[in-house]
Amino acid sequence: MAGHSKWANIKHRKERQDAKRGKVFTKWIRELTVAAKQGGPDPASNPRLRLALDKALGANMSRDIIDRAVARGAGTNESDNVEELSYEGYGPGGVAIMVEAMTDNRNRTAAAVRHAFTKCGGNLGTDGSVAYLFERKGQISFAPGVEEDALMEAAMEADADDVVANDDGSFDVFTSFNSFYAVRNALEEAGFKAADAEIVMQPTTSAELDQDGAEKVLKLIDMLEDLDDVQNVYSNAQISDEIMENLG
């Protein structure tokens, strides 16, 4: 059940980039707003909002900012009409890329995403062009120090799909999309406090890159993540730890 996470190095790099750019607050304000709009302002009956609240608090966002974002989403002001969009395309080396965005102007966002793909040697595709290469999964992450056998046993009892041991000693528990919240709650009740928990698009195949290809793909991912309307970027790029170290 346990294995090595091929995509962990890119995920960890993304976390560093997010922190450096200070984009975290903007991302979670949007998520809080949309979650409240779709499922209501009560986190007890809105699991997506409950997860967003946990993320926002974990990013040290003030309760006042959180409350205002939730109130905005629960209101009826049409000027606050933020919608969720996804874009699909191929980057250099044939790497499949999925982009998730939240925007109040889809034309602006589409133009910016297309420009990033074109500038970095990729191609923005049509709906469905790469989505079949990804699965929507729950990912629950635990910091190093967790007892592996106990975590695996608890994960199996909670009907998790997989437990992945990373090189740094951390663990990722993967779930189906529909069972994410149930598994997360079961692990928490079993005494395992997650360092992070999120819904992700996990690639079902990988595209291995050399250093030149990796540099080009990471440039595209960085450019996409820098866009104000972009929430998440996923790829099926497989980059060795050695190349990641060389690229910093």
From Swiss-Prot:
GO terms for biological process: regulation of DNA-templated transcription. InterPro entries: Integrase-like_N, TACO1_YebC-like_2nd/3rd_dom, TACO1_YebC_N, Transcrip_reg_TACO1-like, Transcrip_reg_TACO1-like_dom3, YebC-like. This is Probable transcriptional regulatory protein PP_1214. GO terms for cellular component: cytosol. Keywords: Cytoplasm, DNA-binding, Transcription, Transcription regulation. Residues 1-21 are annotated as: Disordered. It is found in: Cytoplasm. PANTHER family: TRANSCRIPTIONAL REGULATORY PROTEIN YEBC-RELATED, TRANSLATIONAL ACTIVATOR OF CYTOCHROME C OXIDASE 1. It comes from Pseudomonas putida (strain ATCC 47054 / DSM 6125 / CFBP 8728 / NCIMB 11950 / KT2440). Belongs to the TACO1 family. One of its GO terms (molecular function) is DNA binding. The keyword Cell inner membrane does not apply.
